């Protein structure tokens, strides 16, 4: 009997130890891109310091664009990430079980339609029939839709060339496409290194919000971690807004950019992450409706169905100055 009790006690102890190790080894997996506040947060390490108090590690994974990042969320390789406005719309249309968590203020100058410096294209009207490179389903996809609508050009009257940023730049450099719709830092690099000319940025066409998203299961199981991430993003954004030169010096080597190009990127960003408001959700609904009308997504969407509602305690904390 004593042996049985001892064996049971040992089993309980081992289970307790295993549970403790599992908790100690818990990891939140975050996807980021070569743009935005997350790259500064990663460089400063403040999120790691905060979550370490709860035995949580942070694992960072870089993605070339929003569609690729959201695919990572969809297949479960990351828990949380940041994209522009359009990728979540395409992901929702494809059935991905993701939720909008927070957003940054608009940054319309940090995406643009670029043409080669000697291009005969002088206005949006000249885009008719042209080959235009873009990352399909990325934030700039909506910019292109809006720009064409402004010029009265049906989407079917251009030749979209869907390429990720690195391949799109190569095509742009060798003259295989007539224009390139792209975001920072690729935009700034093309402006400074290739002397690309800006046909238009998103001013008056698209807000270019950055959105923070999570898998629905992660947000449900770990609301405090989600809140901590958003809080740290907000804090580092406030710091970055007040110290743009320091941020540029910090991220320039991470982005493999000259300092003056990094400064251009930093100054065009929006800072100040907040949980999703009804107004921002309504703007996303307009984007979803536009893509549905063009049949670029297979069905109409309801954005509010995929907006995360944070616990009251997190909303109260976020409202404090």
Language-model features: locations:
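Bacterial N-terminal signal peptides
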Residues: 9-18
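Secondary-structure end/capping motifs
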Residues: 220-298
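Short, glycine-/small- and polar/acidic-enriched structural segments
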Residues: 26-153, 161-162, 178-182, 204-206
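Bacterial N-terminal signal peptides that target proteins for export
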Residues: 1-10
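Small-molecule pocket liners
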Residues: 37-38, 107-113, 196-197, 208-212, ...
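Sec/Tat signal peptide C-region and signal peptidase I cleavage site
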Residues: 20-24
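Pocket-lining segment of extracytoplasmic ligand-binding domains
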Residues: 86, 160-253
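Conserved C-terminal helix/tail region of periplasmic/extracytoplasmic solute-binding proteins
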Residues: 289-321
